[in-house]
Amino acid sequence: MLRANYHTHTTFCDGTNTAEQMVQRALDLQFDHLGFSGHMDEEIYMDWDAYVAEITRLRETYAGRLDILCGVELDTLYDPASCPGAEYLIGSTHYVDVDVPFPRAIDYSEEVSQRLCDECFGGDWYAMCRAYFELEAQVYDRLNCTFVGHFDLITRFNDQMHAFDEQDPRYTGPALEAMEHLVSQGVAFEINCGAHNRGRKAELYPRRSLLAALHDFGGEIFINSDAHQTECLNGSFDVAVERAMACGFTHVNVLAHSPAGSVEVHQLALDML
Protein backbone atom coordinates (compact mmCIF):
# COMPACT_ATOMS: atom_id res chain seq x y z
CA MET A 1 0.00 0.00 0.00
CA LEU A 2 1.14 3.53 -0.74
CA ARG A 3 1.81 5.14 2.64
CA ALA A 4 2.11 8.80 1.68
CA ASN A 5 -0.13 11.67 0.62
CA TYR A 6 0.80 15.22 -0.31
CA HIS A 7 -2.58 16.70 -1.25
CA THR A 8 -4.27 17.14 2.12
CA HIS A 9 -6.76 19.80 3.21
CA THR A 10 -7.86 20.75 6.72
CA THR A 11 -9.99 23.27 8.57
CA PHE A 12 -7.36 25.88 7.70
CA CYS A 13 -9.01 25.97 4.25
CA ASP A 14 -11.97 23.91 2.99
CA GLY A 15 -11.30 20.64 4.80
CA THR A 16 -13.58 19.03 7.37
CA ASN A 17 -10.95 17.85 9.87
CA THR A 18 -8.12 19.52 11.76
CA ALA A 19 -4.52 18.96 10.79
CA GLU A 20 -3.95 16.87 13.92
CA GLN A 21 -6.93 14.67 13.09
CA MET A 22 -5.37 14.08 9.68
CA VAL A 23 -2.10 13.14 11.38
CA GLN A 24 -3.89 10.67 13.63
CA ARG A 25 -5.56 9.08 10.61
CA ALA A 26 -2.21 8.87 8.82
CA LEU A 27 -0.76 7.04 11.82
CA ASP A 28 -3.73 4.66 11.84
CA LEU A 29 -2.97 3.92 8.17
CA GLN A 30 0.73 3.42 9.00
CA PHE A 31 1.78 6.24 6.70
CA ASP A 32 5.43 7.17 6.40
CA HIS A 33 4.88 10.69 5.01
CA LEU A 34 2.05 13.22 5.15
CA GLY A 35 2.13 16.50 3.29
CA PHE A 36 -0.34 19.29 4.02
CA SER A 37 -1.36 21.46 1.09
CA GLY A 38 -3.79 24.15 2.18
CA HIS A 39 -5.43 26.27 -0.51
CA MET A 40 -4.18 29.75 -1.29
CA ASP A 41 -6.31 31.36 -4.00
CA GLU A 42 -8.81 34.15 -4.50
CA GLU A 43 -11.68 32.28 -2.86
CA ILE A 44 -9.84 30.42 -0.08
CA TYR A 45 -7.17 32.50 1.65
CA MET A 46 -5.64 30.79 4.69
CA ASP A 47 -4.03 32.39 7.69
CA TRP A 48 -0.61 31.38 6.41
CA ASP A 49 1.36 32.11 9.58
CA ALA A 50 -1.05 30.12 11.76
CA TYR A 51 -1.02 27.26 9.27
CA VAL A 52 2.78 27.05 9.17
CA ALA A 53 2.97 27.26 12.95
CA GLU A 54 0.55 24.35 13.40
CA ILE A 55 2.18 22.12 10.80
CA THR A 56 5.58 22.85 12.37
CA ARG A 57 4.20 21.95 15.80
CA LEU A 58 2.82 18.68 14.48
CA ARG A 59 6.09 17.83 12.75
CA GLU A 60 7.95 18.27 16.02
CA THR A 61 5.32 16.47 18.10
CA TYR A 62 5.20 13.40 15.85
CA ALA A 63 8.88 13.30 14.86
CA GLY A 64 10.07 9.73 14.52
CA ARG A 65 6.54 8.45 13.92
CA LEU A 66 5.52 10.37 10.79
CA ASP A 67 7.39 12.61 8.35
CA ILE A 68 5.19 15.72 8.08
CA LEU A 69 5.69 18.27 5.30
CA CYS A 70 4.28 21.79 4.99
CA GLY A 71 3.14 22.47 1.44
CA VAL A 72 0.56 24.59 -0.32
CA GLU A 73 -1.87 24.23 -3.20
CA LEU A 74 -1.52 27.45 -5.15
CA ASP A 75 -3.58 28.50 -8.12
CA THR A 76 -1.93 29.46 -11.39
CA LEU A 77 -3.34 32.99 -11.09
CA TYR A 78 -1.95 33.52 -7.58
CA ASP A 79 1.40 34.75 -6.26
CA PRO A 80 3.93 32.31 -4.72
CA ALA A 81 5.12 35.17 -2.51
CA SER A 82 1.93 34.69 -0.48
CA CYS A 83 3.27 31.45 1.01
CA PRO A 84 6.90 31.95 2.09
CA GLY A 85 8.64 28.88 3.40
CA ALA A 86 6.40 26.28 1.78
CA GLU A 87 8.35 23.03 1.46
CA TYR A 88 6.58 22.03 -1.74
CA LEU A 89 3.97 23.55 -4.00
CA ILE A 90 1.09 22.01 -5.94
CA GLY A 91 0.40 24.02 -9.07
CA SER A 92 -3.33 23.92 -9.77
CA THR A 93 -5.61 25.67 -12.23
CA HIS A 94 -9.08 26.19 -10.77
CA TYR A 95 -10.01 29.20 -12.90
CA VAL A 96 -10.17 30.55 -16.40
CA ASP A 97 -8.65 34.01 -16.73
CA VAL A 98 -11.81 36.06 -17.19
CA ASP A 99 -13.30 39.01 -15.31
CA VAL A 100 -16.80 38.15 -14.12
CA PRO A 101 -18.96 39.26 -11.16
CA PHE A 102 -19.52 35.68 -9.97
CA PRO A 103 -17.28 32.78 -8.90
CA ARG A 104 -15.06 31.74 -11.80
CA ALA A 105 -13.77 28.43 -10.44
CA ILE A 106 -14.42 25.74 -13.02
CA ASP A 107 -15.12 23.19 -10.26
CA TYR A 108 -17.45 25.44 -8.24
CA SER A 109 -20.68 23.99 -9.63
CA GLU A 110 -22.09 22.70 -12.89
CA GLU A 111 -24.25 25.81 -13.14
CA VAL A 112 -21.31 28.19 -12.68
CA SER A 113 -19.25 26.30 -15.26
CA GLN A 114 -22.04 26.56 -17.80
CA ARG A 115 -22.50 30.26 -17.04
CA LEU A 116 -18.77 30.86 -17.52
CA CYS A 117 -18.96 29.08 -20.86
CA ASP A 118 -22.07 30.94 -22.00
CA GLU A 119 -21.07 34.44 -20.91
CA CYS A 120 -17.33 34.36 -21.63
CA PHE A 121 -16.96 31.88 -24.50
CA GLY A 122 -20.25 32.19 -26.37
CA GLY A 123 -21.35 28.76 -25.22
CA ASP A 124 -18.34 27.10 -26.89
CA TRP A 125 -16.98 24.55 -24.42
CA TYR A 126 -14.00 23.75 -26.62
CA ALA A 127 -12.97 27.42 -26.59
CA MET A 128 -13.18 27.41 -22.79
CA CYS A 129 -11.17 24.19 -22.59
CA ARG A 130 -8.49 25.72 -24.82
CA ALA A 131 -8.32 28.80 -22.58
CA TYR A 132 -8.08 26.54 -19.54
CA PHE A 133 -5.22 24.45 -20.92
CA GLU A 134 -3.39 27.51 -22.24
CA LEU A 135 -3.36 28.78 -18.65
CA GLU A 136 -2.51 25.32 -17.31
CA ALA A 137 0.53 25.22 -19.59
CA GLN A 138 1.91 28.24 -17.70
CA VAL A 139 1.64 26.73 -14.23
CA TYR A 140 5.31 25.81 -13.86
CA ASP A 141 6.56 29.10 -15.30
CA ARG A 142 4.32 31.06 -12.95
CA LEU A 143 4.71 28.99 -9.78
CA ASN A 144 7.83 26.80 -10.08
CA CYS A 145 5.60 24.07 -8.64
CA THR A 146 6.74 20.67 -7.38
CA PHE A 147 3.99 18.91 -9.30
CA VAL A 148 0.87 19.72 -11.31
CA GLY A 149 -2.45 19.24 -9.52
CA HIS A 150 -5.56 17.61 -11.08
CA PHE A 151 -4.49 18.41 -14.65
CA ASP A 152 -7.91 18.06 -16.31
CA LEU A 153 -10.07 19.57 -13.57
CA ILE A 154 -12.20 21.23 -16.23
CA THR A 155 -13.85 17.82 -16.70
CA ARG A 156 -15.21 17.91 -13.13
CA PHE A 157 -18.87 17.84 -14.22
CA ASN A 158 -18.39 16.08 -17.56
CA ASP A 159 -18.39 12.36 -16.72
CA GLN A 160 -21.28 11.78 -19.13
CA MET A 161 -19.60 14.05 -21.72
CA HIS A 162 -22.78 16.09 -22.01
CA ALA A 163 -20.83 19.38 -22.21
CA PHE A 164 -18.00 18.29 -24.53
CA ASP A 165 -16.42 15.14 -25.92
CA GLU A 166 -13.12 14.42 -24.17
CA GLN A 167 -11.96 12.40 -27.19
CA ASP A 168 -12.59 15.27 -29.63
CA PRO A 169 -9.38 16.78 -31.09
CA ARG A 170 -10.68 20.23 -30.11
CA TYR A 171 -10.28 19.05 -26.52
CA THR A 172 -7.38 16.62 -26.71
CA GLY A 173 -5.25 18.96 -28.82
CA PRO A 174 -4.91 21.75 -26.23
CA ALA A 175 -4.71 19.23 -23.38
CA LEU A 176 -1.87 17.27 -24.96
CA GLU A 177 -0.03 20.45 -25.98
CA ALA A 178 -0.11 21.68 -22.38
CA MET A 179 0.90 18.30 -21.00
CA GLU A 180 3.82 17.82 -23.38
CA HIS A 181 5.08 21.34 -22.67
CA LEU A 182 4.96 20.79 -18.90
CA VAL A 183 6.69 17.41 -19.14
CA SER A 184 9.44 19.07 -21.20
CA GLN A 185 10.00 21.43 -18.26
CA GLY A 186 10.61 18.47 -15.95
CA VAL A 187 7.63 18.95 -13.66
CA ALA A 188 5.77 15.88 -12.36
CA PHE A 189 2.00 15.37 -12.39
CA GLU A 190 -0.26 13.96 -9.72
CA ILE A 191 -2.84 11.27 -10.20
CA ASN A 192 -5.56 12.94 -8.18
CA CYS A 193 -8.13 10.65 -6.55
CA GLY A 194 -10.24 13.36 -4.91
CA ALA A 195 -13.38 13.35 -7.04
CA HIS A 196 -13.24 9.57 -7.42
CA ASN A 197 -12.88 8.77 -3.73
CA ARG A 198 -15.81 11.05 -2.87
CA GLY A 199 -18.04 9.43 -5.47
CA ARG A 200 -18.16 12.53 -7.66
CA LYS A 201 -16.44 11.14 -10.76
CA ALA A 202 -15.84 7.76 -12.32
CA GLU A 203 -12.47 8.94 -13.65
CA LEU A 204 -9.36 9.99 -11.79
CA TYR A 205 -7.45 13.11 -12.85
CA PRO A 206 -5.99 12.81 -15.42
CA ARG A 207 -8.37 10.49 -17.24
CA ARG A 208 -6.98 7.22 -18.58
CA SER A 209 -6.19 8.40 -22.11
CA LEU A 210 -4.31 11.45 -20.81
CA LEU A 211 -2.50 9.35 -18.21
CA ALA A 212 -1.30 7.05 -20.99
CA ALA A 213 -0.12 10.10 -22.94
CA LEU A 214 1.72 11.36 -19.85
CA HIS A 215 3.62 8.08 -19.72
CA ASP A 216 4.42 8.27 -23.43
CA PHE A 217 5.72 11.83 -23.01
CA GLY A 218 8.08 10.59 -20.27
CA GLY A 219 6.26 12.21 -17.36
CA GLU A 220 6.58 11.30 -13.69
CA ILE A 221 3.74 10.86 -11.21
CA PHE A 222 2.69 11.36 -7.64
CA ILE A 223 -0.47 9.67 -6.34
CA ASN A 224 -2.60 11.81 -4.04
CA SER A 225 -6.02 11.53 -2.47
CA ASP A 226 -6.83 15.27 -2.35
CA ALA A 227 -8.35 14.46 1.03
CA HIS A 228 -10.73 16.93 2.66
CA GLN A 229 -11.85 14.37 5.26
CA THR A 230 -9.93 11.81 7.30
CA GLU A 231 -11.82 8.91 5.76
CA CYS A 232 -10.50 9.82 2.30
CA LEU A 233 -6.82 10.10 3.22
CA ASN A 234 -5.86 7.02 1.19
CA GLY A 235 -9.07 6.89 -0.83
CA SER A 236 -8.80 5.23 -4.26
CA PHE A 237 -5.04 4.67 -3.98
CA ASP A 238 -5.56 1.09 -5.15
CA VAL A 239 -7.38 2.32 -8.25
CA ALA A 240 -4.66 4.87 -8.99
CA VAL A 241 -1.85 2.32 -8.67
CA GLU A 242 -3.67 -0.10 -10.97
CA ARG A 243 -4.33 2.55 -13.61
CA ALA A 244 -0.80 3.89 -13.45
CA MET A 245 0.63 0.42 -14.04
CA ALA A 246 -1.87 -0.24 -16.84
CA CYS A 247 -0.59 2.92 -18.56
CA GLY A 248 3.01 1.74 -18.31
CA PHE A 249 4.27 3.55 -15.22
CA THR A 250 6.64 1.57 -13.02
CA HIS A 251 7.37 4.08 -10.24
CA VAL A 252 5.65 6.77 -8.19
CA ASN A 253 7.36 9.80 -6.67
CA VAL A 254 7.32 10.56 -2.95
CA LEU A 255 8.64 13.53 -0.99
CA ALA A 256 10.64 13.02 2.19
CA HIS A 257 12.79 15.02 4.56
CA SER A 258 16.48 14.23 4.39
CA PRO A 259 18.48 13.87 7.63
CA ALA A 260 19.54 17.48 7.11
CA GLY A 261 15.92 18.63 6.89
CA SER A 262 15.67 19.40 3.19
CA VAL A 263 12.90 17.87 1.07
CA GLU A 264 13.97 15.23 -1.42
CA VAL A 265 12.16 13.31 -4.15
CA HIS A 266 12.38 9.51 -4.05
CA GLN A 267 10.74 6.85 -6.19
CA LEU A 268 8.87 3.72 -5.14
CA ALA A 269 8.22 0.74 -7.40
CA LEU A 270 4.50 0.47 -8.10
CA ASP A 271 4.57 -3.31 -8.16
CA MET A 272 5.81 -3.31 -4.56
CA LEU A 273 2.86 -1.29 -3.22
Outline where the language-model segments fall.
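A structural motif
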Residues: 31, 86, 144-145, 219, ...
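Hydrophobic residues within beta-strands of alpha/beta enzymes
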Residues: 34-36, 89, 148, 189, ...
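A generic secondary-structure signal
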Residues: 25, 57-58, 135-139, 243
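Domain-core and long-helix interface of multi-subunit machines
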Residues: 12-13, 93-96, 101-217
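A metal-dependent hydrolase metal-coordination microenvironment
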Residues: 2-130, 232
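Charged catalytic cores and adjacent phosphate/nucleic-acid-binding surfaces used
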Residues: 1-8, 19, 156, 161-273
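Non-catalytic positions within long, well-ordered alpha-helices that form the structural scaffold/packing
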Residues: 27, 82, 140-141, 215, ...
